[in-house]
Amino acid sequence: MSAFLLRKNIFTKGKGEQMKAFLILEDGTVFTGTSIGSTRDMISEIVFNTSMTGYLEVLTDPSYAGQAVVMTYPLIGNYGITPDMESLKAWPDGYIVRELSRMPSNFRCEGTIQDFLKKYDIPGIAGVDTRALTKILREKGTMNGMITTNENYDLDEVISKLKNYKVEGVVSKVTCEEKYVLEGTGKKVALLDLGAKKNIAKSLNDRGCEVTVYPADTTADEIIASNPDGIMLSNGPGDPKECTTIIEEIRKLYESDVPIFAICLGHQLMALA
């Protein structure tokens, strides 16, 4: 009985109920839930992730910069926050879950998702039917949405804001500021950081490769001048079509005889080049 009471109490805020929150889509659909993380208003592109584990890796993946992530798996946060981060911070604009575990159990746990979201000022909402939401996104396509705790929102005004919202320039926000090298004794790989998860460079380095990580605005001439054995274009956020300068540099990389391979955004940019 005491364990049940403890679980019940941690879902409340003081003596009152948890703060109500709303997720509003640009087609006018509204989901009601409870606020987790920051309580500020948030507008972003809404996307979904179907992973059953690895929610911390999702939260710290730079590919989600400029997006609010819907987790389709129904229970999130049951092992808390661990050191398994893909970058130095959290990137999504917002976080949407069905149920948030507030009693994580893990010997490596260093905190809760609730505290993690607050630390990085990320608004979130729990109590949403995330699978129904995902079906909407799947059938109607990705759309913008707002998370708000304001119960007196004007729906028409919100929809107008959502339809005019556009994500721009996110690659420049997530790339490294200057190049750095992971020493190795094997092949030399040039990694163009478009928002790379740390495990990409680590996995190459673990296999003996010397990995030089370059900022996204690095020229093809500089990369080729380093005489790499291979070039890798990383994952990253945003619309690939807006990365016109990077696409032009990739075209120049094609003119070299160096093998090129890519992940996620990098692969899309290769196709556009």
Show the residue positions of the predicted features.
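RNA-binding accessory domains that recognize and position tRNA/RNA substrates
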Residues: E17-D221, A225-S226, P240
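Cysteine-nucleophile active-site neighborhood
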Residues: G230, S234-A273
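Short, Lys/Arg-enriched N-terminal segments with co-localized hydrophobic residues
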Residues: A3-Q18
